[in-house]
């Protein structure tokens, strides 16, 4: 079985890692749209267009199932992708919401994400339907920090404090509403001591169990639309192994 995964950049490899750990025999093709990262500052129309282009690229690679490992694309494009493509399509928002509701004792839940994800209200609406009190905030500097490989040290620490100071004492659970954010999880946990920090990558992998046959050769192909300065370092950091990335321009519709 072959699974396709796409994200706006390198952060979606956190989902890729969780899926490979859960289903080690499946073949996986990953696409990071690093030439156009971040999606979180784009209009809905642009996010949908980029998402369809990424999905088409993976369709041409012969995938049997698609995971949208980008919260912004999940918020704005998931339903259109489900309608347009002939294979099952999964996002990362619903699994993260379910995991947060399971872990929270007070139902006072925080959500952080890109500007577009927070503006969409996708997390807030799903949590409020379950009776949660929701606190949300956009953290637009987190993705550039991760893409630059700046995940530890004084700069990310100060940025985390700047964005998350209003959550202290208000929430018992925080959803990382962007697949880049788990790379900053240590700094976030250090600042919000005692708060459940929800990384939806593992929850997303679990949500596939009724649809994935753990069959194949366990192969992995990594495609990116641009070779960013820290790409190889991020691959090693997230996946724990060195995998040669392939750079492609086939995604773009000219």
From Swiss-Prot:
Name any one GO molecular function.
Answer: glutamate racemase activity
For this protein, the Enzyme Commission number is: 5.1.1.3
Q: Which GO terms describe its biological process?
A: cell wall organization; peptidoglycan biosynthetic process; regulation of cell shape
Q: Does the keyword Transit peptide apply?
A: no
Kindly tell me the pathway this chain contributes to: Cell wall biogenesis; peptidoglycan biosynthesis
What does the UniProt keyword field contain?
Cell shape, Cell wall biogenesis/degradation, Isomerase, Peptidoglycan synthesis
Q: Catalytic positions?
A: 70, 178
Where, by residue number, does substrate bind? 7-8, 39-40, 71-72, 179-180
UniProt keyword annotation of Isomerase present: yes
Q: Name one Pfam family in it.
A: Asp_Glu_race
The role this protein plays is: Provides the (R)-glutamate required for cell wall biosynthesis.
Concerning its family, UniProt says: Belongs to the aspartate/glutamate racemases family.
List, alphabetically, the HAMAP family matched: Glu_racemase (MF_00258)
Q: Which protein are we looking at?
A: Glutamate racemase
Q: Which organism is it from?
A: Aquifex aeolicus (strain VF5)
Q: Which gene encodes it?
A: murI
